[in-house]
Amino acid sequence: MRVLLAPMEGVLDSLVRELLTEVNDYDLCITEFVRVVDQLLPVKVFHRICPELQNASRTPSGTLVRVQLLGQFPQWLAENAARAVELGSWGVDLNCGCPSKTVNGSGGGATLLKDPELIYQGAKAMREAVPAHLPVSVKVRLGWDSGEKKFEIADAVQQAGATELVVHGRTKEQGYRAEHIDWQAIGDIRQRLNIPVIANGEIWDWQSAQQCMAISGCDAVMIGRGALNIPNLSRVVKYNEPRMPWPEVVALLQKYTRLEKQGDTGLYHVARIKQWLSYLRKEYDEATELFQHVRVLNNSPDIARAIQAIDIEKL
């Protein structure tokens, strides 16, 4: 099976990709989106979001990375897709699933689900702009407020010439509510298409991954939030390994505080460590105590000292 690391805006950036791919066995990472409006973006934008482009589109541990674009205008999606692969990206991905109000308000992300023709035009333009040997993938949800258009959406992606399709098994309006996950709908789409379909949504452990694949028939999954809850989740999902022990999680957090974020204003680790601990609390009781300790700290040096001061040998 294949396990992909999902794009998560404001969460899974290059530093987190570096850490997670070092302790996992991901087959591919998708970047946070590059927002495309009405221009060919400068090289520095691509390098900021995907510094791995300067390392043959791989993380330091060797996992492939693909740039994701978000936009609605085919011409500019095409030009920026061409630039991404010229810079070394292993293919490109089109975001048609982001539920953010800000993104949707500007006509991107999940808004495209309302009109499958827009998905077709965008994906087709990207496919034509990218060399045939490189993949063009599309990430969608089942629809905007219902799944009525799920087949139209899927057909649009395939007819556009996309290499593969990632389906998040909920509509935009359903957000991330667990009770609405519909792996069967993903399976219905998989049976309809001739291109690979990757299942996404509510995959938290070995059991849920097996259940998702059994219901959907997919042999590839994409994981997002769960990758932060359990830092070695790809190995749990692929090989039924136990979750990472808490001392190893702390060691990972300590390494994180030592990494430098390019262009950091001093607030990067403050926000990200707290954010990561809030995810870890869902799986590790020890993370709650640590979160309570650092939540009142407001600068990177203090956060780093608090994390570094933990004696792993005593855990």
Swiss-Prot record:
Keywords: Flavoprotein, FMN, NADP, Oxidoreductase, RNA-binding, tRNA processing, tRNA-binding. The record marks R35, N95, Y176, R272, K274, Y279, R295 as: Interacts with tRNA. It catalyses: 5,6-dihydrouridine(16) in tRNA + NADP(+) = uridine(16) in tRNA + NADPH + H(+); 5,6-dihydrouridine(16) in tRNA + NAD(+) = uridine(16) in tRNA + NADH + H(+). Its EC number is 1.3.1.-. FMN binds at P7, M8, E9, Q68, K139, N200, G201, E202, G224, R225. Disruption phenotype: A dusA dusB dusC triple mutant exhibits a complete lack of 5,6-dihydrouridine modification in cellular tRNA, whereas each single mutant exhibits a partial reduction, compared to wild type. One of its GO terms (biological process) is tRNA dihydrouridine synthesis. Catalyzes the synthesis of 5,6-dihydrouridine (D), a modified base found in the D-loop of most tRNAs, via the reduction of the C5-C6 double bond in target uridines. DusC specifically modifies U16 in tRNAs. This is tRNA-dihydrouridine(16) synthase.
